[in-house]
């Protein structure tokens, strides 16, 4: 008569064990795996090193500070699976296939650069895999009809929009702009956006000309530009031609109120090479250490904040790369912010289903240490704002937008004669 009671008693420990195991499983879902064909060697190795450091920094923040990704009633940790694509297109395609079919990752982060990102997109699309772009700025990536490609870095056409907005606000009498840039797809895309925005704002484009890659003498172009007497110049393409552009402007004594050069002017090596000639020169950047995006700024703007503060990110980055002297640049910041965007999207979707997460990304609006996030229907980033930096007394100062600036712009910039005499570009 008492055997059933005894049997129940004997079964009780097993039942308790089952419940505990089930609860533990519910509280700790399987890791969410980010796959990445990273540029660890080859021509994009420096940018790739920064990107990996940014990703690992924000993964650590998610796992250790945020507690993981809310999913299935628990908190799922993030895991990171990367391979070296050697900055080669053929490696990108094969590695994306491997990450999806062999490693069974939940999302693929694109490699650095527009070319590599575009090469990998059809592979991810063919597998129905979410493909997040942190380093491909070319707008053409988002004109191919890809459903699963989503951008974190701002598009090339947005590079000089802030520069033009700034000049219109601080110098409403400035009307004449000259465009002189490298004949490359990237620079042409940047200037296409600049030209359209300049016309929208009512500026007169008094000069527009390109120069070939690898140019060694810009004297004929700059002489023709000088004759149009522009108020300001938007130019450049990459580091070497940007440096040449500035140096030969000084040689020809071409003075303008503002000179903004893409790619070159934001690099420390630019000032190191040119010294006082670089004073007052500006350039657009996706992110700079010193921006003022913060939890308080997000609250004031009525938007959600996620992630570490800027200083916390820098500390996490240094730990990730194992170098206490390395400062993260925008390659690290945009890659790290991409981790945060994915985490929020999974949290909002409540599932790892790719279509649900992609839909959540389309509805997402938030701020992080990198700035604002918002994408259009094609996946193109439209929320992030470029920052403009200016060399002032040998230091890079963020001068635009006002919400991120660490100092006021110096406008007009000193003349080359004044700079040769020791005058600094101070507001």
Where in this protein do the model-derived segments appear?
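Hydrophobic alpha-helical
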Residues: 114-125, 230-252, 338-341
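Beta-alpha junction/loop-to-helix N-cap segments that form part of ligand/metal-binding clefts
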Residues: 33, 46-53, 65-143, 152, ...
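Segments of small-molecule ligand-sensing domains
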Residues: 317-333, 341-400, 405, 426
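Extracytoplasmic "Venus flytrap"
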Residues: 32-58, 83-89, 112-113, 180-188, ...
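Extracytoplasmic ligand/sensor domains, especially the bilobed periplasmic-binding protein
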Residues: 53, 105-208, 257-292
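Immediate post-signal peptide segment of exported/extracytoplasmic ligand-binding proteins
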Residues: 25-36, 69-77, 168-175
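Extracellular/periplasmic periplasmic-binding protein-like sensory domains
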Residues: 249-336, 398-406, 414-426
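Short, low-complexity disordered leader/linker segments with a strong preference
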Residues: 1-33, 100, 420-427
């Amino acid at each position: 008569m008492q055997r059933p009671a005894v049997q129940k008693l004997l079964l009780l420990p097993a039942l308790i064990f089952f419940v505990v195991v089930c609860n533990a499983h519910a509280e700790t879902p399987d890791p969410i795996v980010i796959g990445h064909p990273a540029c660890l060697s080859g021509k994009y190795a420096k940018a790739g090193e920064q990107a990996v450091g940014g990703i690992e920094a924000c993964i650590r923040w998610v796992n250790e500070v945020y507690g993981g990704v809310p999913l299935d009633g628990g908190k799922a940790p993030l895991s990171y699976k990367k391979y070296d694509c050697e900055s080669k297109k053929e490696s990108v395609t094969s590695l994306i296939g491997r990450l999806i079919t062999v490693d069974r990752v939940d999302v693929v982060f694109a490699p650095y650069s527009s070319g590599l990102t575009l090469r990998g997109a059809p592979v991810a699309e063919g597998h129905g895999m979410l493909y997040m772009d942190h380093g491909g700025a070319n707008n053409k990536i988002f004109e191919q009809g890809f459903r699963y490609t989503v951008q974190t870095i701002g598009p090339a056409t947005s590079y000089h929009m802030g520069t033009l907005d700034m000049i219109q606000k601080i110098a409403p009498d400035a009307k004449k702009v000259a465009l002189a840039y490298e004949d490359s797809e990237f620079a042409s895309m940047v200037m296409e956006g600049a030209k359209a925005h300049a016309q929208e704002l009512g500026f007169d484009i008094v000069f527009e000309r390109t120069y070939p890659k690898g140019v060694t003498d810009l004297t004929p172009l700059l002489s023709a530009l000088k004759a149009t007497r522009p108020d300001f110049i938007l130019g450049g393409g990459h580091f070497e031609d940007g440096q040449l552009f500035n140096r030969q402007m000084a040689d020809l004594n071409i003075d303008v109120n503002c000179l903004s050069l893409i790619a070159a002017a934001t690099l420390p090596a630019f000032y190191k090479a040119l010294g006082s000639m670089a004073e007052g020169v500006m350039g657009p950047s996706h992110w700079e250490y010193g921006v003022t995006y913060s939890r308080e700024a997000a609250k004031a703007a009525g938007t959600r904040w996620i992630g570490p503060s800027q200083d916390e990110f820098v500390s996490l980055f240094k730990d990730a790369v194992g170098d206490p002297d390395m400062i993260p640049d925008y390659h690290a910041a945009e890659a790290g912010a991409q981790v945060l965007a994915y985490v929020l999207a999974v949290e909002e979707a409540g599932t790892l289903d790719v279509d649900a997460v992609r839909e959540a990304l389309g509805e997402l609006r938030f701020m992080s240490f990198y700035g604002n996030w918002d994408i259009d229907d094609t996946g193109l980033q439209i929320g992030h704002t470029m920052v403009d930096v200016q060399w002032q007394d040998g230091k890079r100062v963020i001068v635009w937008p006002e919400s991120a600036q660490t100092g006021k712009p110096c406008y007009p910039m000193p003349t080359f004669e004044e700079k040769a005499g020791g005058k600094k570009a101070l507001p």
